Every structure is written in structure tokens, then in C-alpha cells.
């Protein structure tokens, strides 16, 4: 991360479809770390800004903007532009009204994680009440969101992670059971999943981890189950022995929340409306384990790389 530094930039007035926002907080996400290493699928031209998303207050809007007005509290996406900043100008399509019951720090940690969980479990996984949901990487941001949404949808939620201590927090988020996946440098959880599901295996598996975790997941999935591919935090993209899908009748489903909205614009709008509604009804509670100042943004990414977080890490802008 030797190339990461704070610089001064000139912010222009918003164009006709743009919104100028005073940033109050920005979330630190795993893709931010990958982008500093040149490993993320989206590779903006150098130099680029870090911080995929944030929350703030609208200062002014372009002439054709009708979605928000000056003074509104909003969340926004900023991939490539960089939310680790005091002011930002973004297209109105990247902006949503902030859930009224969240702080700016919570709101900065909200949109990407909970939208990913919603598209995964509702749109792609079609999770039903009473089904069993296995959430890998449950102590991270997208895992936290999946645990809370799974509980809201009426599933039996099994949370997994590498740290027994950190997994305790997932019980507060709604997990019914927890499983430590890594013991003595060995991955093993499928027998515990089978025990917790009456020998059947999980109906839906939410996997932002990949690697060995995926390899073991295909051996504890129920007949007709759905494995949702959310990411590869382990660093290894696994391969699928296709005969396993034939024998066990399961589906492997890729999830890209942003692309889903681009391909299905109306449902994309509905997705954002639904996660905001559920949040304002009190069912979502983004957990922020640590905040950094804007001057400490580089340290926030280092903290993420050390796998210390529970829930989300946020950069606060004052």
C-alpha cells in the first residue's frame, strides 16, 4: 500500500445528473484492499480514489436531478471515485436516501453489504421460511448482513467463521448456531452442518470465502440446495467437481448485486426500497467495530487486511 496517500483535489459543481455530497463517513470494504494490490476485477485507471461507498449530506444537485434535494441525508456508491474524501460528486443513480434510523457511520456500512445479502438470499437463492441457511464469513460485513436478513426471512441460520470468539457476536445478529470452520489449520464443518440439519445439509449456502470452504460446502448441501457465490476472501477461486452437482442435485449461483440491477432496473429499484424498509422497521443493525479518521484511511485498510474486524470498519470524515 505504498502508493496510498491523501491528496487535494478540485471539486467541480455537479453536472445535470450529478449530486454534490458532503461526506460524513465511508465504509472500508474488502475490494478496497484488493484494489491496492491490483487484484480486484474492476481496475480503474491510475490514480484512483479508495472507498466504495459512504454516507453524507447533499450540498447541491444538477439541473435534471429529482431523486434528492439539498439537505437530504444519503448513502452513495463511489467505486473508482473514492469515498475517502470530504466532498464528492456522483451520478444520481449511485445515491439512495439514508435509512432514517441509522447513524452516518452505520449508513456508510449499509448499502453494499445489505444489498448483496438481499440479492443473494431473495433474488438468487430464493430462501424460504423454515429453510436452513449456512452463512460463511459470518463475522464480516456481507456475512453480518446475510445473518440478519436470513433471520428476518425466517430461516434457521448457521454462522461460520475462523474465530470462535468473534462468532459470539453473530448470535446477537440472529444466528441460531455457530461453527468454527478452521481448527488446528484444518477446515472441517460439514459434519456439524449435517448434525444441525437432521442429516440433510443446508438448503442455502452463502459463500463470500471460496477456497477450501467451498470445497467442503458441496459436501453438506441438501438435495435441491443453492450455493451462492458471493466472493473469494480466502484468495483461492475453487473449481467444482461437476459430478457432485449431478449426484446431489444442487445449484451453484453467482451473485453480483450491481450487475443484477443493471440487467433488471425495476427490480434493482425494488431491492433498494426493500432493504431500506426492512432497516427502518428495525430488523437491520449494521455493526461498526472500529472507526478511523480520514487522515488514518490507510491504516483502516491495513486493519482490514489483518482480519481483525467484526462487522464493518468505517472512516469518519469531519
PLM regions and their residue ranges:
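Glycine-rich beta-strand-centered segment in the early N-terminal region that forms part
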Residues: 10-27, 39-82
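NAD(P)H dinucleotide-binding glycine-rich loop of Rossmann-like/cofactor-binding domains
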Residues: 34, 76-137, 184
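Short glycine-centered segments of the SAM/dcSAM-binding site in methyltransferase folds
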Residues: 73, 132, 156, 225-226, ...
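Mid-domain Rossmann-like dinucleotide-binding core that forms the NAD(H)/NADP(H) cofactor-binding site
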Residues: 113-183
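Adenosine-nucleotide cofactor-binding segment
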Residues: 151-213, 266-270
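Glycine-rich phosphate-binding loop and adjacent beta-alpha segment
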Residues: 161, 170, 212-284, 316-318
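C-terminal capping/lid region of NAD(P)-dependent oxidoreductase domains
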Residues: 277, 281-287, 298-318
Amino acid at each position: 500500500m505504498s502508493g496510498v496517500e491523501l491528496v487535494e483535489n478540485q471539486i467541480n459543481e455537479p453536472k445535470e445528473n450529478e449530486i454534490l455530497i458532503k461526506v460524513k463517513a465511508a465504509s472500508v470494504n474488502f475490494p478496497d484492499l484488493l484494489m491496492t494490490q491490483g487484484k480486484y476485477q474492476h481496475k480503474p485507471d491510475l490514480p484512483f480514489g479508495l472507498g466504495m461507498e459512504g454516507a453524507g449530506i447533499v450540498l447541491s444537485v444538477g439541473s435534471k436531478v429529482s431523486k434528492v434535494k439539498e439537505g437530504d441525508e444519503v448513502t452513495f456508491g463511489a467505486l473508482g471515485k473514492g469515498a475517502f474524501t470530504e466532498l464528492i460528486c456522483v451520478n444520481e443513480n449511485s445515491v439512495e436516501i439514508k435509512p432514517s434510523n441509522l447513524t452516518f457511520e452505520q449508513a456508510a456500512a449499509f448499502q453494499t453489504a445489505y444489498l448483496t445479502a438481499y440479492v443473494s438470499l431473495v433474488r438468487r437463492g430464493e430462501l424460504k421460511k423454515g429453510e436452513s441457511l449456512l452463512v460463511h464469513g459470518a463475522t464480516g460485513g456481507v456475512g453480518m448482513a446475510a445473518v440478519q436478513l436470513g433471520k428476518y426471512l425466517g430461516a434457521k441460520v448457521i454462522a461460520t467463521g475462523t474465530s470462535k470468539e468473534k462468532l459470539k457476536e453473530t448470535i446477537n445478529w440472529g444466528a441460531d448456531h455457530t461453527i468454527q470452520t478452521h481448527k488446528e489449520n484444518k477446515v472441517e464443518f460439514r459434519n456439524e452442518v449435517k448434525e444441525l440439519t437432521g442429516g440433510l445439509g443446508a438448503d442455502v449456502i452463502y459463500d463470500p470465502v471460496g477456497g477450501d470452504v467451498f470445497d467442503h460446502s458441496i459436501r453438506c448441501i441438501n438435495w435441491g440446495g443453492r450455493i451462492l457465490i458471493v466472493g473469494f476472501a480466502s484468495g483461492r477461486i475453487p473449481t467444482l467437481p461437476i459430478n457432485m452437482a449431478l449426484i446431489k442435485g444442487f445449484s451453484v449461483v453467482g451473485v453480483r448485486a450491481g450487475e443484477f440491477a443493471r440487467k433488471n432496473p425495476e427490480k434493482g429499484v425494488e431491492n433498494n426500497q426493500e432493504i431500506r424498509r426492512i432497516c427502518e422497521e428495525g430488523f437491520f443493525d449494521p455493526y461498526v467495530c472500529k472507526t478511523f479518521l480520514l487522515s488514518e484511511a490507510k491504516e483502516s485498510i491495513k486493519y482490514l487486511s489483518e482480519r481483525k474486524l467484526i462487522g464493518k470498519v468505517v472512516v469518519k470524515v469531519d
